Design a protein with these regions (language model features):
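Detector for C-terminal structural segments
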Residues: 1-122
Length: 122
């Protein structure tokens, strides 16, 4: 895929930070993760210059929306599915907050002893 010797290929990307740019940055011309061959100077301008220079969050997101619209009109990719996951967590597990990235950081997780957990459930 990296050498662009394909007619169709399947690729995946899991966001590593919560921001639209995490996905939109994948399609800039010559970008290290742009294995599509997509190249558009207008798109690059929006992602590399306009969005970073936006004065407000709303303005930045409007630029991202415009870039995403351009990307979907040119359709260098065909989104097939999105990753989902569910977690069953025992009631004695504490300190495991949900997060948008669905990453499990177990650093601050602890198990409440069974006696305390049983009292809490009643």
């Amino acid at each position: 895929v990296t050498n662009m010797h394909f007619q169709i290929a399947r690729r995946g990307w899991i966001g590593d930070y919560v921001d639209p740019n995490n996905f939109l940055d994948l399609f800039i011309t010559g970008g290290g993760n742009n294995n599509t061959g997509f190249a558009d100077p207008e798109y690059d301008e929006m992602i590399l210059r306009k969005a970073p220079q936006a004065a407000t969050r709303e303005e930045r997101f409007a630029v991202f929306h415009e870039a995403e619209t351009l990307l979907m009109e040119q359709m260098p990719i065909l989104p097939v599915y999105t990753y989902t996951s569910k977690h069953l967590v025992h009631h004695s597990v504490k300190g495991l907050p949900p997060n948008l990235m669905d990453s499990l950081n177990l650093k601050y997780v602890w198990l409440e002893d069974n006696e305390q957990a049983t009292k809490t459930d009643d």
